[in-house]
Curated annotation (Swiss-Prot):
Pathway: Purine metabolism; GMP biosynthesis via salvage pathway; GMP from guanine: step 1/1; Purine metabolism; XMP biosynthesis via salvage pathway; XMP from xanthine: step 1/1. HAMAP family: XGPRT. 5-phospho-alpha-D-ribose 1-diphosphate binds at R37, G38, R69, D88, D89, L90, V91, D92, T93, G94, G95, T96. PROSITE patterns: PUR_PYR_PR_TRANSFER (PS00103). It is found in: Cell inner membrane. Signal peptide: none annotated. Its cofactor is Mg(2+). E.coli cells express two distinct 6-oxopurine PRTases, with very different specificities for hypoxanthine, guanine, and xanthine. Salvage enzymes allow a more energy efficient synthesis of purine nucleoside monophosphates compared with the de novo pathway. The kinetic analysis suggests that E.coli HPRT is mainly responsible for the synthesis of IMP and that XGPRT primarily salvages guanine and xanthine. Purine salvage pathway enzyme that catalyzes the transfer of the ribosyl-5-phosphate group from 5-phospho-alpha-D-ribose 1-diphosphate (PRPP) to the N9 position of the 6-oxopurines guanine and xanthine to form the corresponding ribonucleotides GMP (guanosine 5'-monophosphate) and XMP (xanthosine 5'-monophosphate), with the release of PPi. To a lesser extent, also acts on hypoxanthine. Does not ribophosphorylate adenine. This is Xanthine-guanine phosphoribosyltransferase. Xanthine binds at D92, I135. It comes from Escherichia coli (strain K12). Homotetramer.
C-alpha cells in the first residue's frame, strides 16, 4: 500500500449519516447485521440514525496460508438477509464480500468505503478509495500529544 487515508471519528459519523439518509425510510428494514469487526462501529452509527434496535453480527476471521486467504465463519446471523442491512466498514478485494453475499443473498449490503475491486459487490457505499490505499480507521488509532515544531 503506497498511500494512507486517515479517517477521523467526525468523518466516520458524517459518512455514516450520509449512508443512513440513503437507506430511508427506516421502516423497510427488519434490522442490521454488522460484519465483525470493521462493521461494528458503522453498524452502531446506522442503528442510531435509522432508529433500528435489532442489531446482529456475522463474525468472519481471515487467515493467510501461503498467500491464499482463507475465511472462517465464527458466528453468523440466521436467515438469508431478507429485510436486513449488512454493513462493513470497507470493501477491498471482495473476499469477505463474496462470502457475505453467499450467506445473505437477499440482504442490502453496504459499506462506508469502497475500493475498485470490491465495488461491484456492494449495493451502496459513500467514499471511493484507490485500490492501493491503506485506510486507518479511528478505532485503530490513539490520540497522542504532538510537540510543537519549534520545540518550545
Amino acid at each position: 500500500m503506497s498511500e494512507k487515508y486517515i479517517v477521523t471519528w467526525d468523518m466516520l459519523q458524517i459518512h455514516a449519516r450520509k449512508l443512513a439518509s440513503r437507506l430511508m425510510p427506516s421502516e423497510q428494514w427488519k434490522g442490521i447485521i454488522a460484519v465483525s469487526r470493521g462493521g461494528l462501529v458503522p453498524g452502531a452509527l446506522l442503528a442510531r440514525e435509522l432508529g433500528i434496535r435489532h442489531v446482529d453480527t456475522v463474525c468472519i476471521s481471515s487467515y493467510d496460508h501461503d498467500n491464499q486467504r482463507e475465511l472462517k465463519v465464527l458466528k453468523r446471523a440466521e436467515g438469508d438477509g431478507e429485510g436486513f442491512i449488512v454493513i462493513d466498514d470497507l470493501v477491498d478485494t471482495g473476499g469477505t464480500a463474496v462470502a457475505i453475499r453467499e450467506m445473505y443473498p437477499k440482504a442490502h449490503f453496504v459499506t462506508i468505503f469502497a475500493k475498485p475491486a470490491g465495488r461491484p459487490l456492494v449495493d451502496d457505499y459513500v467514499v471511493d478509495i484507490p485500490q492501493d490505499t491503506w485506510i486507518e480507521q479511528p478505532w485503530d488509532m490513539g490520540v497522542v500529544f504532538v510537540p510543537p515544531i519549534s520545540g518550545r
